[in-house]
Amino acid sequence: MEKVTIRDFLKKKEKKEKIIMLTAYDYPSAKIISQTNLDGILVGDSLGMVVLGKENTLKVTMRDMLIHLDAVVKAKPPQLIVADMPFLSYETSIKDAVKNAGLLARHGADAVKLEGGEEMRDVVRAIVRAGIPVMGHIGLTPQRFLRIGGYRILGKREKEEEQLLKDAKTLEEAGAFSIVIENTYSDVAKKITESISIPTICIGAGPYCDGQILVIHDLLGLSDFTPYFAKKYIDLRGLIRRAIEDYISEVKEGKFPGKEHYKSRDS
């Protein structure tokens, strides 16, 4: 598989081929993904909750992102690697935004993702001008859950729908190469997808986007809580628990280690 670029994402929209992404936060996951036909990897700030046990994404730092991005990059996946810009790494000033986006790019990100719509126009434009591709993120934006009164579906009110459409068009005009649409109504996501020329990637926004993304822990059944919009393709949590219980039993019963697992001088 050849290295995936942002041009491949744009071509897929033109050809009406689905773009498929997953999150990854470590070397083993990225190595496995590298052996699949997945299009893109998001090193997401969701790592704060699913890997580091934090309450929300607000507590994820640039240091956290760089450590996990480094681990993914070392697996050398051919997929497009997109890195999330964590909370307060791009909101305080355009200068900080470009500097932090550049830091992620230097550590191997092919693109960066940031949350927000119309209000992020100048930030997106500046990062793109610096030569770094930007993926937008609208709808439910977890870094702003306090402002919207918690984690809720957006787009029910006409005003919210109009703002989402405006946000998408503004991000496209600012130079974003694609947009994640999270937790909105499927008909709203469809309208957005049909109104812009760059790809839309859905998570909890229905089947009409140009692509889909899931948190890998949800897909594998490793999460404490699986949101309604995610599908658990395997119960890896249960398999791991059973493997650990088998290990405990075999050690107690003297079955492990077996002769094949150690060296004896008299053998």
Swiss-Prot record:
Protein origin, superkingdom: Archaea
EC number annotated for this UniProt entry: 2.1.2.11
UniProt record similarity statement: Belongs to the PanB family.
Keyword Cytoplasm appears in the UniProt entry: yes
Pathway recorded for this protein: Cofactor biosynthesis; coenzyme A biosynthesis
Record's keyword terms, sorted: Coenzyme A biosynthesis, Cytoplasm, Magnesium, Metal-binding, Transferase
Gene from which this protein is expressed: panB
InterPro entries reported in the protein's UniProt record: Pantoate_hydroxy_MeTrfase (IPR003700), Pyrv/PenolPyrv_kinase-like_dom (IPR015813), Pyrv_kinase-like_dom_sf (IPR040442)
Cysteines paired by S-S bonds: none
Catalytic residues as annotated in Swiss-Prot or TrEMBL: 182 (proton acceptor)
Residues annotated as binding Mg(2+): 45, 84, 115
Molecular functions per Gene Ontology: 3-methyl-2-oxobutanoate hydroxymethyltransferase activity; magnesium ion binding
Role played: Catalyzes the reversible reaction in which hydroxymethyl group from 5,10-methylenetetrahydrofolate is transferred onto alpha-ketoisovalerate to form ketopantoate.
CDD domains: KPHMT-like
GO cellular component: cytoplasm
Positions annotated to bind 3-methyl-2-oxobutanoate: 45-46, 84, 113
Protein name: 3-methyl-2-oxobutanoate hydroxymethyltransferase
Top-level enzyme category: transferase
Subcellular location: Cytoplasm
Segments traversing the membrane: none
